[in-house]
């Protein structure tokens, strides 16, 4: 039976960032199941259109990729999401998998990065590996994307766990709670004298470059600076962290093992 591995991410239009993060994840996932042929899909229609119009590069949606795999005779397909939370983008994959499940003998789906309590614990350990050495009055602030979906609560949960465990970092979100102003007020009250800004995103794309690290007056860097807390931005996506890539590999194999147990 022909076997495939389909790695699905939101996507990025930055080629170097894609190589450092998405390709790095794909490489580790593919190495963990060498009997499968590797394929890629993006969930962002906007990024797919931009790559097609700007670069002439065609990337499939998950639905298109699965339809092509079925047409090519793949009957055992393992999908791994590279999303951070179980939000709208991941639910899009779930719906498309359910729709096309009858076309395959076996179709598995590995969950996003933050899907269980243990994932939060492991993520904090993984983040520690990429954090710079800090003075006593410094902290790292991680920028999450945020969401209108109820899964936005994952960012507040991670932030709460960090605070409760005296982990030297906080988490905010660009498009939902916790807003950066809340973090600025809280850190100022704590007497924090400097922060390091890092993306809590698979890739360091538009949000990290413009909303986090730019000299624009509304960027997180400038807002911390204006509040008297010097901010140093770091432009590296989570996909560059080997420990985080290992979490995605573990999720892939959890889904595959569960499918074996259910079939037994």
From Swiss-Prot:
Superkingdom per UniProt: Bacteria
Chain sites annotated for binding Co-sirohydrochlorin: 45, 84-85, 88-89, 92, 202-203, 207
Entry EC no(s): 4.99.1.3
InterPro entries named in the record: Anaerobic_Co-chelatase (IPR010388)
Keyword Metal-binding in record: yes
Keywords assigned by UniProt, alphabetized: Cobalamin biosynthesis, Cobalt, Lyase, Metal-binding, Porphyrin biosynthesis
GO biological processes: anaerobic cobalamin biosynthetic process; porphyrin-containing compound biosynthetic process
Catalytic activity: Co-sirohydrochlorin + 2 H(+) = sirohydrochlorin + Co(2+); Co-precorrin-2 + 3 H(+) = precorrin-2 + Co(2+)
Induction note: Part of the cob operon, which encodes enzymes involved in cobalamin biosynthetis.
Gene3D superfamilies: 3.40.50.1400
Catalytic residues (UniProt): 145
Pathway(s) annotated for this protein in UniProt: Cofactor biosynthesis; adenosylcobalamin biosynthesis; cob(II)yrinate a,c-diamide from sirohydrochlorin (anaerobic route): step 1/10
One example GO MF annotation: cobalt ion binding
Residues engaged in binding Co(2+): 145, 175, 207
Pfam families in UniProt: CbiK (PF06180)
Further details from the record: In the absence of Co(2+), can act as a precorrin-2 ferrochelatase since, in conjunction with a uroporphyrinogen III methyltransferase such as CobA from P.denitrificans, it can complement an E.coli cysG deletion strain. However, this complementation is easily inhibited in the presence of low concentrations of exogenous cobalt, a result that can be explained on the basis of a higher specificity for cobalt over ferrous ions.
NCBIfam families from the UniProt entry: SiroCoChCbiK (NF047852)
Family classification: Belongs to the CbiK family.
Protein name, per record: Sirohydrochlorin cobaltochelatase
Organism annotation: Salmonella typhimurium (strain LT2 / SGSC1412 / ATCC 700720)
Record lineage: Bacteria, Pseudomonadati, Pseudomonadota, Gammaproteobacteria, Enterobacterales
Name of the gene encoding the protein in the UniProt record: cbiK
């Amino acid at each position: 039976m022909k076997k495939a591995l389909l790695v699905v991410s939101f996507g990025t239009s930055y080629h170097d960032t894609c190589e450092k993060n998405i390709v790095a994840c794909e490489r580790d996932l593919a190495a963990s199941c060498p009997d499968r042929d590797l394929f890629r899909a993006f969930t962002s229609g906007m990024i797919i259109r931009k790559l097609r119009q700007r670069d002439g590069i065609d990337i499939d949606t998950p639905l298109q990729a699965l339809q092509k795999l079925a047409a090519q005779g793949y009957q055992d397909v393992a999908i791994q999401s590279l999303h951070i939370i179980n939000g709208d983008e991941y639910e899009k994959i779930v719906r498309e998998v359910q729709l096309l499940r009858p076309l395959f003998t076996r179709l598995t789906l590995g969950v996003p990065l933050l899907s269980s309590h243990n994932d939060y614990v492991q993520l904090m350990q993984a983040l520690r590996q990429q954090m710079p050495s800090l003075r006593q009055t410094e902290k790292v602030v991680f920028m999450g994307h945020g969401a209108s979906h109820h899964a936005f609560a994952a960012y507040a949960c991670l932030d709460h766990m960090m605070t409760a465990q005296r982990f030297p970092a906080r988490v905010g979100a660009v498009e939902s709670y916790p807003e950066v102003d809340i973090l600025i007020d809280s850190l100022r009250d704590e007497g924090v004298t400097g922060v390091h800004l890092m993306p809590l995103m698979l890739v360091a794309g538009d949000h990290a470059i413009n909303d986090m690290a730019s000299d624009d007056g509304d960027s997180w860097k400038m807002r911390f600076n204006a509040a008297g807390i010097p901010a140093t931005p770091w432009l590296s996506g989570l996909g560059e962290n080997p420990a985080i890539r290992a979490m995605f590999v573990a999720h892939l194999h959890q889904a595959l093992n569960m499918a074996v147990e259910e079939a037994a």
